[in-house]
Each structure stands twice: as structure tokens, then as C-alpha cells.
Amino acid sequence: MTEAQHQGDWADRMEQAVLDSAIERAPALGWNGRLVRAACEAQGLSRGDEELLLPNGARDLAALLWRRHDDQAMAALADIDPATLKIRERIARGVEARLEAAAVDGEAEKRVAGFMALPTNADLALTLTWATADRLWRWAGDSATDWNHYSKRAILSGILVPAMTLRLFDGKAAADAFVAARIENVMSFEKWKAGKDFDAPMTRITDLLARLRYGARA
């Protein structure tokens, strides 16, 4: 093992250890710099170590928790064959798995939700939610590469955030009902959209750009 690999393994292990300490302390301290320092101290890390491990402080720690829950959700979905489910069932199961992963660390996740709601963290919240939506759609079998790739992830991102809030603060039944209603809304829209050539404007733009770049076809 090279020195770089050893350092990388240490960093990965220590990130998870610090995250465990943070989850334990978040209900009392909130999600902030104080929490980061306390969690790092619990693992015997100096301020210098903390700055190396989590240069963006509480933002990095929030991202670690979010991605842990993503990984846990995907592990829970690993034994499910999405091909045996209708598309709406795939999305419902995927969202449910992600919400339940977060609910395990409910009190800490509530602090993260408040932290992510701050205007200064909007970019982080958007990036992480989009990544979650992408992983869920890929599990569901989505292979779109056109503008539908982006619209699907944008729509699912818009479902995930309020559903997460409902799961944490109002419980599973409220979250499940919300998700079911939103999926029904989306499916109704897709049925209405079917047969209408909404791709035409995008196709014309693509053709125009191709002509500008490569010239008119002979």
C-alpha cells in the first residue's frame, strides 16, 4: 500500500468516526462549528487535523451524513429487482428507502435540515439532492440522455426535500401520503404530455446548433 493510499484509508475511516460522534452530539449542539470541533475532539483530532479532514467544516460533515444515507438507501434497494415494478412503484420504493435511511438518525438529520435550509447552504442542498435523485433514477433503470434526464431529476428533487421534512417532523404516514400524491400528479402530467411533441423545440435548437457548427448538409 502506498503512502497516499494509507492516508486516504485513514481519512475515510476518520471521516466516518467523526460523523458517528457528530450524530451523537448534534441533538444538543446543533449542526455548526461547535459540533465539528466536539466531534473531532472526541476522536482525538487537533484543530489542524480538523482543517485537513473537514476544510469546509459543518458543510463537509453534512455532506458526509447525506451521502451515508444515500449509500444506506441503495443497500436497502439492492435486493429489489426494479424490473418487476411499475415505474411509479420504483420511484416510491426508492424515495421510501431514502427517507427511512435518514429517519434512523432522525434527531441529527433534523439539525442538518435546518442547517441546509440556510441561504448560504442552498448550493450544497441542491447538489446533494440532485445526486440523490440521480442515484434513485439510475436504480430505477432510467437511461435517458436527452433533456428528460434533467427534468426527471429536477422533479424528483422537488419531491425529496418536502418528503424528507414530513418524514422527520410529521412521521412516515404523512411522508408516504405526500409522495404517493406527488407521484400521481407527475404520472397524470406524463399521460397528458404523451403524444404532444414537446421535444420539437429542443430538437430544432439542436439541429440549428449542429448546422452552425458543422454547416448545412449537402
Regions found by a protein language model. Name each.
Residues D12, A76-R111:
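Hydrophobic alpha-helical connector segments
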Residues H149-L168, A177-N185:
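Hydrophobic alpha-helical segments that form the core
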Residues T120-D142, Y150-L160:
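Amphipathic alpha-helical packing segments from all-alpha helical-bundle domains
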Residues A101-D123, T127-W130:
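Amphipathic alpha-helical segments used for helix-helix packing
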Residues V18, L35, L61, L65, ...:
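Residue-level detector of well-ordered alpha-helical segments, enriched
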Residues T2, F169-A218:
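C-terminal peripheral helix-coil segments that are non-catalytic and often amphipathic
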